[in-house]
Amino acid sequence: MDIRKAYLDFFASKGHEITPSSPLVPDDATLLFTNAGMVPFKSIFTGEIPRPNPPRKTSCQTCIRAGGKHNDLDNVGYTARHHTFFEMLGNFSFGDYFKEQAIAYAWEFVTEVLKLPKDRLYVTVHENDDEAFNLWQKHIQKERIYKFGDKDNFWQMGDTGPCGPCSEIFYDQGQEHFNSSEDYMGGDGDRFLEIWNLVFMQYERSADGVLSPLPKPSIDTGMGLERVTAIKEGKFSNFDSSLFMPIINEISKLCNKTYVYESGASFRVIADHIRSSVFLLAQGVSFDKEGRGYVLRRILRRALRHGYLLGFKQAFMYKLVDIVCDLMGGHYTYLNEKKDFIKEQIRLEEERFLSTIENGIEIFNEELKNTKEIFSGEVAFKLYDTYGFPLDLTADMLREKNLKVDEEKFELFMNEQKARAKASWKGSGDKTASGDFKNLLEKFGENHFVGYEKAECESKILALLDEDFKEVSTLKDAGWVMLENTPFYATSGGQSADSGFIAKREVLDTQKFFNLNLSFIKAGEELKVNDIVHARIDTEKREQIARHHSATHLLHHALREILGSHVSQAGSLVESNKLRFDFTHHKALNKEELESIEKRVNKMIINSSEAILENMPLEEAKKSGAIALFNEKYQGNVRVLTLGESKELCGGTHVKNTAQIGSFYIVKESGVSAGVRRIEAVVSKAALEFVKNQLEELSKVKDELKNNDILSGIKKLKNEILSLKNELKNSSKTELDSKNIQGVEICVKRIDNGDIKAMIDDFKNKFAKAVILLIQVKDEKITLAAGVKDVPLKAGALVKEAAQILGGNGGGRDDFATAGGKDLSKINEALKQSLETIEKAL
């Protein structure tokens, strides 16, 4: 049974709009990852944005819980139901239906669609929620309804805001399979398994803790797909279900070991972690030293360590990507599109860690011998810093031995090297959190962007805000303006904002806050709410931005065509004088690839293709071949831009014809992080400026070479350098005065020219036994070097003694060493002392 499809189809039949899974990287600075089905709808529940139409949605949301407040990483593999990646089925009502229908829908789906036995089902409600208690009695016997307090049956988003009682549906897995004293409703045993949580958001909690009824209460429900699949298939562990067993079987085949549940924690860890890794990489998260990329790295490296326990000594995780795509690519089609890229990224990361894991485990085991209860924080840091062992991986290894790590000491060492990694994820902490945006949305709704059609317009000032985003009635200082209709494009999708004027006030920036388009203006003449003002953008700047933005689309197409379909946008910046495009690719681009890409983009520009803009539903756009970005949230109809062979979803401003772009030059290619490359480029006027600067540089080179033929001048210069090198080499072969003491040839002297190392090497090569110390002065800088051959004397000690006389220091190998000095007046003393030391040693 395809439970995912059955769930979505069921609620679609009840008037719910099916919402595609939102990105794992949420549009929420307080969250590391999307960790619940309601996260994409958070702003609707809090009232920050208006209720959608229709006011009921359903989704199957991909979620990650590994890092931050919601972190299940440590438990994965050791319990039947913890996962770093899971799918959350949910149905949502935004001020539409409430408890009665939510309960009826849930009961109908569980009993008539899933066909779970009614005599195995139990329900919990909040102890004070008599309404829910009575409603449930229409469907289930009173004896099967349990009341619990706030701890179990009250949900809240935070210390303040929407909240309310919740009701949970439980499934009895059978008394015959469990014998724990905690196996009762409300206990901590596994017999009674929660499968669905219905949250009744009916209150608003104020800062002083008072609960006030919401005028339009809402519904938020969540049911884990992995859990309900296991129940439907009669399995006591999610890992024994059809969602995981094909992966576990593949692991078993690769390591040639049989999976047994009781001792199979490593199999389960790997099966879970490969799913997380595949989805995160597919959605643009890359392995990194901090933030989300570091969580991804921790997940994969934890899996690799468990692979090591199963006997894997070579990269193997990448071989599991195919089975994950086979299992989930039917619903999440982008997995198949990204499969080759994902495999390559995982393989490269595996090789990075496998090169150090063995040495790291040896160091871990050595320290383990000296550990009674607490493992050294210093050694844990060494494992992290030198061998790439995340702290939670070390803690995971210690947990198996019932030991703990000294985290305080570890953090101490981490703080001493702040530049190496961040200790925790931090939110944005900006002033917008306390801004008056909710009031503006309630009063006016979203204002209208007219900049696609107009460069200027007359418009009414709906609101004015100071620099702290607080509403004011008049504004002379710098602040924010909300126009009823605005021609100013707000920073979005990588495109920088328009500038221009509102009345006589200069517009420096335009940003979107909760879908409100606000322009930031310099201090100047007083503006008032309800004023009718003239707004106009800087059209020249807009045109240059449009040219660069359209060029990024052509660049994206060229990259996919030349490098492969695994390439996807990982970030962009579009300004009036340059573009920056980040994309997924596993290695640096060579000269030939860059030339091909540049040539391909310019060919598309020359083709003079008309820009075609269309508005259509998201699914229709995807079916048409348009490329959508994971870090963008699409709602309702989407805007599709076709530029020749390029077709993408985009809300930015663009040229009407590719010929308007002019010419395209790649300025730089570089790496951003593991698996992400960056191209910087210029077009149009910026391209002309780039070429002009290049020509000026060439002119300067000609002047320096004193030759109009640059290649000829460089060739001549190279020949001169070669000639000088030969002269220097020959000067190093100058005969050095020496004397023989007991069969050892000795040379101690000051030299003015020559390659000091080459001279010492030549001297040593001439004799069977030799000791040489030379002092050279160049530009007031003293260099010492000593060489020893087949003599019981160390060059390092010899040169160090002489250097100390000269106020310097140094050392090196027994056969060759160098040093530096400062005091020119003591050179003769140093030479004399060195000779005495040599003679004494012989």
Curated annotation (Swiss-Prot):
HAMAP family, alphabetized: Ala_tRNA_synth_B
GO biological process, one term: negative regulation of DNA-templated transcription
Cofactor: Zn(2+)
Full protein name: Alanine--tRNA ligase
Gene: alaS
Binding locations of Zn(2+): H549, H553, C650, H654
Organism, as annotated: Campylobacter jejuni (strain RM1221)
GO MF annotations in UniProt: alanine-tRNA ligase activity; aminoacyl-tRNA deacylase activity; ATP binding; tRNA binding; zinc ion binding
Purpose of the protein: Catalyzes the attachment of alanine to tRNA(Ala) in a two-step reaction: alanine is first activated by ATP to form Ala-AMP and then transferred to the acceptor end of tRNA(Ala). Also edits incorrectly charged Ser-tRNA(Ala) and Gly-tRNA(Ala) via its editing domain.
Keyword annotations of the record: Aminoacyl-tRNA synthetase, ATP-binding, Cytoplasm, Ligase, Metal-binding, Nucleotide-binding, Protein biosynthesis, RNA-binding, tRNA-binding, Zinc
Record CDD domains: AlaRS_core
